[in-house]
Amino acid sequence: METLFNSSVAVSGRDQQSTGFAWWSGNARLINLSGKLLGAHVAHAGLIVFWTGAMTLFEVAHFIPEKPMYEQGLILLPHLATLGWGVGPGGEVIDVYPYFVVGVLHLVSSAVLGFGGLYHAIIGPEVLEESFPFFGYDWKDKNKMTTIIGIHLILLGSGALLLVLKAMFFGGVYDTWAPGGGDVRVISNPTLNPTVIFSYITKSPWGGDGWIVSVDNMEDIIGGHIWLAFICIIGGVWHILTKPFSWARRALVWSGEAYLSYSLAALALMGFIANCFVWFNNTAYPSEFFGPTGPEASQAQAFTFLVRDQRLGANVGSAQGPTGLGKYLMRSPSGEIIFGGETMRFWDTRAPWLEPLRGANGLDLTKIKYDIQPWQERRAAEYMTHAPLGSLNSVGGVATEINSVNYVSPRSWLSTSHFVLGFFLFIGHLWHAGRARAASGGFEKGLDRENEPVLSMKLLD
């Protein structure tokens, strides 16, 4: 029988008297108990992985193959589909068994993490330094903190490499730009040119430039992950082998709450970037799985009505609309031929179903007359009625002319949730950064519990 590190499983060291924090402060009570804090983190990871596995199985159980993913309120299966599992040409789901396997693997993993969390929270050593010096730490030990940063960076780089390996050697990934409407393909020639990869970072975030969100091919996405993996792993090794420079020792606040604030800022930034990526990008987030982007749905409506009226005999190249501009086609500010009407504001939209109809100077009139394929018509008609707002238009941010019923786009859900979560994470960063700086400066005040206003208020009854 194993000898317990703690002879008692009582909550000593976790009450207000011994830690200075009440129960509602959560893990703040464990600031100086590295073993118990490890248990809290491992258990938290178990909860996250459990949700992932359970929700994946829930989506598999409710999945209807005849309907597109974005019409079924799915947010996990679309991510698995982008990795090339269970899908074929055009994004058609041909096998849900891989999704079932992923869900079960996550459930099993969550059980292991859950037991690990309980072990470290109840049975394991309260302080790691005494029993396992390598895993122990002191918040003010700058060298140990940068070593921990290095380990995290190596893990992040390894995660980026996993996507690279899947795309290049283990079956490929789904590419919405594959000819004929998208397909799973192996990315055998990723972009490694640093000029191409790092030019995304220097792009303007406004208009058609779109910063890193403008990436529109899988070669650049996988090449970017190769560069990220290289930078993260090299950076991780650097931080493990070196000590912080003197300027970093002076400039940064070295405390547990400071590290929490740094982490929250990083997560907030990721949330804001993910928000933009999900909303605008249809390469990393293919419209076959996540639904069309707003501009894409608007262009799809113009295209659908152009196809209809052209079959009815309209001369789409010269027909005028009520404003005197082209009804179906017009010129962009840079002289390209674009769709007319209200969708003119989205003239620089790029979509796999539309690009084959472009020529050297925008939309090619000859291709529009003779080369439109049935799959393009079907996809545009589907996207037209599945705009991420539930509508093609909005006035002052309020959706108007609703043209879909009982529909919430995964694109709307994911972008909104990531923005909201990113916002609150940023507020958390400001809060904890302020507290950490105040504590470091020696002027942290906190709340005066003895003179709280609530103590002088009348009872509710």
Curated annotation (Swiss-Prot):
Swiss-Prot/TrEMBL keywords: Acetylation, Chlorophyll, Chromophore, Cyanelle, Manganese, Membrane, Metal-binding, Phosphoprotein, Photosynthesis, Photosystem II, Plastid, Thylakoid, Transmembrane, Transmembrane helix
MF GO annotations: chlorophyll binding; electron transporter, transferring electrons within the cyclic electron transport pathway of photosynthesis activity; metal ion binding
Transmembrane segments: 57-81, 122-143, 166-188, 243-263, 279-300, 435-459
GO BP terms, alphabetized: photosynthetic electron transport in photosystem II
Signal peptide from the UniProt entry: none
Subcellular location: Plastid, Cyanelle thylakoid membrane
Residue positions where N-acetylthreonine is found in the record: T3
InterPro entries noted in UniProt: PS_antenna-like, PS_II_antenna-like_sf, PSII_PsbC, PSII_PsbC_sf
UniProt propeptide residues: 1-2
Membrane topology: Multi-pass membrane protein
Entry-annotated residues carrying Phosphothreonine: T3
Record-linked Gene3D superfamilies: photosystem ii from thermosynechococcus elongatus
Pfam families: PSII (PF00421)
Cofactor: record remark: Binds multiple chlorophylls and provides some of the ligands for the Ca-4Mn-5O cluster of the oxygen-evolving complex. It may also provide a ligand for a Cl- that is required for oxygen evolution. PSII binds additional chlorophylls, carotenoids and specific lipids.
Main subcellular location: plastid
Binding of [CaMn4O5] cluster, residues: E355
GO cellular component, one term: cyanelle thylakoid membrane
Assembly and oligomerization: PSII is composed of 1 copy each of membrane proteins PsbA, PsbB, PsbC, PsbD, PsbE, PsbF, PsbH, PsbI, PsbJ, PsbK, PsbL, PsbM, PsbT, PsbX, PsbY, PsbZ, Psb30/Ycf12, at least 3 peripheral proteins of the oxygen-evolving complex and a large number of cofactors. It forms dimeric complexes.
Family indicated by similarity: Belongs to the PsbB/PsbC family. PsbC subfamily.
The protein's role, per its UniProt record: One of the components of the core complex of photosystem II (PSII). It binds chlorophyll and helps catalyze the primary light-induced photochemical processes of PSII. PSII is a light-driven water:plastoquinone oxidoreductase, using light energy to abstract electrons from H(2)O, generating O(2) and a proton gradient subsequently used for ATP formation.
Protein name per Swiss-Prot or TrEMBL: Photosystem II CP43 reaction center protein
UniProt organism field: Cyanophora paradoxa
Gene: psbC
